[in-house]
Regions:
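Short, glycine/acidic-rich beta->alpha junctions
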Residues: 163, 282, 294-295
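Mid-bilayer segments of alpha-helical transmembrane spans in multi-pass integral membrane proteins
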Residues: 106-121, 138-146, 150, 154, ...
Length: 296
C-alpha cells in the first residue's frame, strides 16, 4: 500500500474518531429530551407532527406496545411504497414516462427498503420516476434508518434501567431520529455533494450524439413498459443501432446523502456510488464512506 493510501485511511479514522464524542453527546440529548441546539428550528415541526398525528409525546410505552407501533408503521410503509411503484405511470414527476413496476419487483423493493436491507434488484434510472425515488425510496431511507435507531435506543433504555415497565415512545423516538439527527446531517451532506457535481434536478434525461454508432440488443417491451417474453420465459430483444445516448439525471444528491447516512443499499442509479453522477470526486467518496460509519 502506498503512503498516500495509508494517509487517506489515517485521515478517515482520525475524522471519524473526532466526531464520535460530539455526535454521541448530541444524540444522547436528543433521545433524553434535553436541549440540543436544534430545538428552535426543529421543535415547532416536532410538535406539529405530534398534533397532526395525535401523538402524546409524554406517554410511555411498554415493549409490546412499542413493538406493535413499530410493526404497524413499517407495514403501512410497505403498502404505500408498493402502491406508489405500481401507480407511478399515472402520477406526476415522471418526465421519462416510466410505467408500473412489475408486482414481484415492486414487493421486493418495498420490503427491502422498509427493512433497511442493502439490496437492490432494480435500475432506478431506467425504471423509477422521480416521485417514486423521492416520496418512496428517499422517505424510506429516512424512516427505516430512524426505526432502527429508535429500536436500539429502546433496547439501551431497557438494559440500563434497573426497574422499568416502559422503554419510551416509538413515535417520539422515530420523529426525533428523523428531525434532529438524520435530516440535518443529510442536508449538510447533500449540499457538499451538489457543490462537487452530484446531480440534483427535476429536469429530464439529457441526450447526446455519439461519435460512433453502436449496435446492441434492445429488450422488446409491451404497452405497460414490461419486457415481452418468449416461450422459454426469456426476454425478447431486437438489434438496434444507437446514435445517441440518454444521460439519466434527477434528484440524486438528496437521496444519496440519506442512503449513506442510513446505510441503506438502494440508490438512485443501478451502479450506486460507482456512478459519477452520484460520486464525482475523491472528496465525495471520502464523505460518503464517512457518512456510512458516522452513526452505525
Amino acid at each position: 500500500m502506498t503512503v498516500n493510501g495509508l494517509a487517506q485511511i489515517g485521515l478517515f479514522f482520525f475524522v471519524l474518531v473526532a466526531l464520535v464524542k460530539p455526535l454521541g453527546w448530541y444524540m444522547a440529548r436528543v433521545y433524553t429530551g434535553q436541549a440540543c441546539g436544534m430545538d428552535r428550528v426543529m421543535g415547532p415541526f416536532e410538535r406539529l407532527i405530534y398534533r397532526v398525528c395525535g401523538v402524546r409525546a409524554t406517554e410511555e410505552m411498554d415493549w409490546k406496545t412499542y413493538a406493535v407501533a413499530m410493526l404497524l408503521f413499517n407495514v403501512t410503509g410497505l403498502v404505500a411504497l408498493y402502491v406508489l411503484q405500481r401507480l407511478q405511470g399515472y402520477l406526476p414527476l415522471n418526465p421519462t414516462g416510466f410505467g408500473a413496476v412489475a408486482p414481484d419487483l415492486a414487493f421486493n423493493t418495498a420490503s427491502s427498503f422498509i427493512t433497511n436491507t442493502n439490496w437492490q434488484a432494480y435500475a432506478g434510472e431506467s425504471m423509477l420516476s422521480y416521485l417514486t425515488q423521492m416520496l418512496g425510496l428517499t422517505v424510506q431511507n429516512f424512516v427505516s434508518a430512524a426505526t432502527g435507531m429508535a429500536i436500539l435506543v429502546a433496547l439501551i433504555r431497557g438494559l440500563t434501567a434497573q426497574t422499568a415497565a416502559t422503554i419510551g415512545n416509538f413515535w417520539v423516538d422515530l420523529t426525533r431520529s428523523t428531525l434532529y439527527i438524520l435530516l440535518p446531517l443529510s442536508a449538510v451532506l447533500a449540499l457538499v455533494l451538489v457543490s462537487q457535481g452530484t446531480v440534483q434536478t427535476f429536469g429530464s434525461s439529457h441526450h447526446t450524439t455519439l461519435l460512433q454508432s453502436v449496435t446492441y440488443e434492445k429488450p422488446i417491451v409491451d404497452a405497460a413498459g414490461q419486457p415481452v417474453l418468449d416461450e422459454k420465459g426469456a426476454a425478447k430483444t431486437e438489434s438496434t443501432a444507437g446514435t445517441e445516448q440518454a444521460l439519466a439525471v434527477g434528484p440524486v444528491a438528496s437521496q444519496v446523502a440519506i442512503k449513506h447516512l442510513g446505510t441503506n443499499g438502494g440508490g438512485f442509479f443501478n451502479a450506486n456510488a460507482a456512478h459519477p453522477y452520484e460520486n464525482p470526486t475523491p472528496l465525495t467518496d471520502f464523505m460518503l464512506i464517512l457518512a456510512e460509519a458516522l452513526i452505525a
